[in-house]
């Protein structure tokens, strides 16, 4: 191992760059649908040795060493994000004649931007780099911090944070209930990078012992939490409707009536005799292909498809009149509709997809020919705030539309009082690629972090009822058409506290930074 580490440390030029990119790309194997978390042991061991090579070279100036550390981290991140996000280009091919030109921006440009965060993590870790365990702690702390920064800078995009690679199954997801995604990400980097200590032997016994304890604790806590009894409470049965409509068909005006009628047919499918009647039916995001409030006949048809006392929750487009001569505002919304055709509650999407649902700096970019992917004048408007949808029977749903479910910190706002999360989405843009699987895993982690069940309806999948520990009670696979009835228990309160998760993340970060600083100061004193 020492010989291998020495060879990697001595790499330079294109060989070093190629290994950095390849190491990041291999790490993407830990992500869904593969879920091979062990790949990250290789990736982060390689990264540490590459950084050792630019940190231990006495011929390099301080500033040059920092630049080299940044570029190694950037190349590592570029490989990781290209391998993990290449499927984003699939959305642009739905209307290839209009958006194919942007394919390089999605497949290479976005990874190049996201890789800057990993470059900064390595640069910051280089400031605290030392021999032995301290450098592993520094790298782990900086990756945790930059993953957190990635969740909100420039609207945020924490997709495929390193922590997801450490949580492929429910047994390995439960640590998120205590540490949150970013705390798990930091400790995951520590564990995955620990084998690099075998390359120099300094601090190897302690580092590997700590990594082993963390990994066993990760599994042990998972087993403990999964063994806890289910919460007591009222049972609610939901029907998930998955129409599996091709995205091109959804955008074709001539198919709108047929699409709406298909949802009505699936809603009215008889319930098997051995199952309870659904209390709530859920349709996916932007299911209704017209402004529902402007079409009373559609509301009557919905009422006709529902049985007495049932409620439909559906994704739709909401319009808001702005007065004479002013174009209306449009919102990506959720409606709750009762069996009388009355709208009981509504919620607007707050966190919009840039360049998908709106164009930032639209006045400037529109002159360059850059427009929304969605066919809507001016794009969607941002919802004012996110609030609970209160339904009959004590059901209080926290609404998340599409990729709003990927933002852990947004769970803090307005979650109090909720007894379930509703997530409607349309992943048909991404076809049969890793995208829908990655999106689904992130929804499962939000369930674990909040301790609340998630009711998830997706146009082409994956639709599922997820319990508060990330387990899938019932669902429909990707690209399947049909309905699924599932029953869950309304809990009196969430099993976890997302505010505590955030505090615990910063506590972990402080411990890692303290270890890195102590190690760094010890190295300086030895040199002096």
From Swiss-Prot:
<keyword id="KW-0997">Cell inner membrane</keyword>
<keyword id="KW-1133">Transmembrane helix</keyword>
<feature type="active site" description="Proton acceptor">
    <location>
        <position position="285"/>
    </location>
</feature>
<dbReference type="GO" id="GO:0042158">
    <property type="term" value="P:lipoprotein biosynthetic process"/>
</dbReference>
<keyword id="KW-0012">Acyltransferase</keyword>
<keyword id="KW-0808">Transferase</keyword>
<comment type="function">
    <text>Catalyzes the phospholipid dependent N-acylation of the N-terminal cysteine of apolipoprotein, the last step in lipoprotein maturation.</text>
</comment>
<feature type="active site" description="Nucleophile">
    <location>
        <position position="402"/>
    </location>
</feature>
<feature type="domain" description="CN hydrolase">
    <location>
        <begin position="241"/>
        <end position="490"/>
    </location>
</feature>
<dbReference type="Pfam" id="PF00795">
    <property type="entry name" value="CN_hydrolase"/>
</dbReference>
<dbReference type="InterPro" id="IPR036526">
    <property type="entry name" value="C-N_Hydrolase_sf"/>
</dbReference>
<feature type="transmembrane region" description="Helical">
    <location>
        <begin position="178"/>
        <end position="198"/>
    </location>
</feature>
<dbReference type="GO" id="GO:0016410">
    <property type="term" value="F:N-acyltransferase activity"/>
</dbReference>
<comment type="similarity">
    <text>Belongs to the CN hydrolase family. Apolipoprotein N-acyltransferase subfamily.</text>
</comment>
<dbReference type="InterPro" id="IPR045378">
    <property type="entry name" value="LNT_N"/>
</dbReference>
<comment type="pathway">
    <text>Protein modification; lipoprotein biosynthesis (N-acyl transfer).</text>
</comment>
<feature type="transmembrane region" description="Helical">
    <location>
        <begin position="69"/>
        <end position="89"/>
    </location>
</feature>
<feature type="transmembrane region" description="Helical">
    <location>
        <begin position="99"/>
        <end position="119"/>
    </location>
</feature>
<dbReference type="InterPro" id="IPR004563">
    <property type="entry name" value="Apolipo_AcylTrfase"/>
</dbReference>
<keyword id="KW-1003">Cell membrane</keyword>
<protein>
    <recommendedName>
        <fullName>Apolipoprotein N-acyltransferase</fullName>
        <ecNumber>2.3.1.269</ecNumber>
    </recommendedName>
</protein>
<keyword id="KW-0812">Transmembrane</keyword>
<feature type="active site">
    <location>
        <position position="349"/>
    </location>
</feature>
<feature type="transmembrane region" description="Helical">
    <location>
        <begin position="203"/>
        <end position="223"/>
    </location>
</feature>
<dbReference type="GO" id="GO:0005886">
    <property type="term" value="C:plasma membrane"/>
</dbReference>
<dbReference type="InterPro" id="IPR003010">
    <property type="entry name" value="C-N_Hydrolase"/>
</dbReference>
<dbReference type="Pfam" id="PF20154">
    <property type="entry name" value="LNT_N"/>
</dbReference>
<keyword id="KW-0472">Membrane</keyword>
<feature type="transmembrane region" description="Helical">
    <location>
        <begin position="8"/>
        <end position="28"/>
    </location>
</feature>
């Amino acid at each position: 191992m020492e010989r291998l580490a020495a060879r990697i440390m001595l790499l330079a030029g294109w060989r070093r760059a190629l290994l950095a990119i390849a190491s990041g790309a291999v790490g993407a194997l830990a992500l869904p649908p593969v879920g091979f978390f062990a790949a990250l042991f290789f990736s982060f061991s390689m990264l540490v040795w590459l950084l050792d090579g630019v940190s231990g070279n006495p011929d390099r100036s301080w500033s040059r060493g920092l630049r080299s550390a940044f570029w190694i981290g950037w190349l590592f991140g570029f490989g990781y994000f290209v391998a993990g996000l290449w499927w984003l280009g699939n959305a642009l091919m739905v209307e290839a004649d209009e958006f194919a030109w942007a394919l390089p921006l999605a497949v290479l440009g976005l990874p190049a931007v996201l890789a800057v965060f990993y470059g900064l993590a390595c640069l910051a870790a280089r400031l605290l780099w030392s021999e032995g365990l301290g450098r592993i702690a520094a790298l782990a702390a900086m990756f945790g911090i930059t993953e957190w920064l990635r969740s909100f800078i420039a609207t945020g995009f924490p997709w495929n944070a390193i922590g997801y690679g450490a949580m492929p199954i429910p047994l390995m997801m439960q640590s998120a209930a205590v540490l949150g995604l970013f705390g798990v990400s930091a400790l995951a980097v520590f564990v995955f990078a620990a084998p690099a200590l075998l390359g120099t032997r300094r601090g190897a016994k302690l580092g590997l012992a700590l990594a082993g304890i963390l990994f066993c604790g990760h599994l042990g806590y998972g087993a403990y939490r999964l063994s806890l009894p289910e919460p007591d409470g009222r049972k609610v049965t939901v029907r998930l409707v998955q129409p599996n409509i091709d995205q091109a068909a959804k955008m074709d005006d001539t198919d709108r009536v047929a699409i709406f009628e298909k949802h009505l047919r699936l809603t009215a499918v008889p319930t098997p005799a051995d199952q309870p009647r659904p209390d709530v039916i859920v349709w996916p995001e932007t299911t209704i292909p017209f402004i529902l409030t402007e079409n009373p006949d559609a509301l009557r048809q919905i009422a006709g498809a529902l049985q007495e006392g049932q409620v439909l929750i559906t994704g739709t487009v909401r319009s808001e009149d702005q007065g004479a001569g002013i174009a209306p505002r449009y919102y990506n919304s959720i409606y709750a509709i009762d069996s009388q055709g009355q709208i009981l509650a509504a919620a607007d999407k707050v966190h919009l997809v840039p360049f998908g649902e709106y164009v930032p700096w639209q006045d400037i970019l529109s002159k360059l020919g850059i427009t929304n992917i969605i066919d809507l004048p001016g794009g969607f408007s941002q919802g004012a705030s996110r609030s609970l949808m209160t339904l009959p029977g004590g059901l209080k749903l926290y609404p998340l539309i599409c990729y709003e479910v990927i933002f852990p910190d947004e769970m803090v706002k307005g979650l109090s009082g909720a007894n379930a999360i509703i997530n409607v989405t349309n992943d048909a843009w991404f076809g049969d690629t890793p995208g829908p699987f990655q999106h689904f895993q992130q929804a499962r982690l939000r369930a674990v972090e909040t301790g609340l069940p998630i009711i998830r309806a997706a146009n082409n999948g994956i639709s599922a009822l997820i319990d508060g520990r990330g387990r899938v009670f019932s669902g429909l696979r990707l690209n399947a058409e049909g309905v699924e009835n599932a029953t869950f228990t309304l809990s009196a309160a969430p099993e976890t506290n997302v505010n505590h998760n955030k505090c615990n993340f910063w506590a972990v970060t402080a411990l890692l930074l303290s270890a890195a600083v102590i190690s760094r100061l010890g190295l300086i004193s030895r040199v002096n």
